């Protein structure tokens, strides 16, 4: 089909992602720094390329930051780039995480979890004295469930137990909006080509602040 001159692919500016509820019991007793370390560890464990290759299969690009690749900066240039004034933590991916999951990513995830107070056995799995049990909220679309199952397997590499909570669309939206979740499926397509359209949802009073920042 890609070789068909009548076939055209139109890109969208948006990001498919998983969101944490910052008020979840998952973070009870943790400092701000420890909670950040936990979230980073989860992100390092997820194999984005596998999801794109096996579930997406339509040429999506991996997300290594929330603002998508190609979004304008409002000054005639591209927002997501390394400059003299700012270099992304992962310079090669121009984002916050490597573009390819590796053994180093898994090992870094373990170290981050250790810094958050978790212990590991000799075989690299979470010790039974410090388990992580998390519920992932998603709607009942086949593709979304397949992505959740891939994430479940990835997190299981270090012993994180993720339960998938599948809800009908309207119930899913309400539960997520009310903050009745630990970890949830999210996605945002930009309404207009400016980073503020992606970033304003993290303001406390935003109607899209599903992560419950400042609440």
Model-derived regions, located:
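Extracellular/periplasmic solute-recognition and catalytic clefts
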Residues: 1-24, 49, 53-62, 190
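Acidic-aromatic pocket-rim loops
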Residues: 2, 8-14, 173-215
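Extracytoplasmic/secreted cell-surface and envelope-processing proteins
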Residues: 18-19, 27-30, 144-146, 172-175, ...
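Short helices/loops that flank or line small-molecule/ion binding pockets
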Residues: 1-2, 37, 149-158, 170-181
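Extracytoplasmic/peripheral linker and loop segments enriched in polar/acidic and small residues
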Residues: 37-40, 44, 52-53, 98, ...
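General small-molecule cofactor/ligand-binding pocket signal
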Residues: 8, 135-137, 163-167
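Append "and occasionally in soluble cytosolic enzymes with long acidic Gly/Pro-rich linkers
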Residues: 33-153
């Amino acid at each position: 089909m890609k070789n068909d001159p009548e076939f055209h692919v139109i890109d969208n500016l948006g990001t498919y992602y998983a969101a944490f509820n910052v008020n979840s019991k998952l973070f009870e007793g943790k400092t701000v720094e420890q909670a950040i370390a936990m979230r980073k560890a989860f992100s390092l464990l997820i194999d984005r390329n596998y999801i794109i290759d096996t579930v997406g299969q339509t040429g999506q690009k991996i997300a290594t930051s929330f603002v998508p690749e190609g979004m304008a900066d409002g000054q005639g240039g591209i927002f997501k780039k390394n400059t003299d004034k700012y270099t992304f933590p992962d310079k090669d991916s121009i984002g916050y995480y490597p573009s390819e999951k590796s053994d180093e990513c898994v090992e870094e995830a373990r170290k981050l979890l250790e810094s958050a107070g978790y212990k590991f056995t000799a075989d690299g799995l979470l010790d039974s004295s410090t388990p992580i049990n998390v519920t992932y909220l998603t709607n009942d679309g086949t593709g979304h469930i397949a992505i959740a199952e891939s994430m479940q397997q990835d997190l299981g590499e270090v012993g994180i137990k993720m339960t998938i909570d599948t809800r009908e669309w309207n119930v899913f939206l309400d539960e997520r909006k009310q903050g009745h979740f630990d970890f949830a499926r999210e996605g945002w397509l930009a309404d207009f080509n400016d980073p503020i359209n992606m970033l304003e949802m993290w303001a406390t009073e935003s109607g899209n602040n599903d992560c419950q920042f400042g609440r």
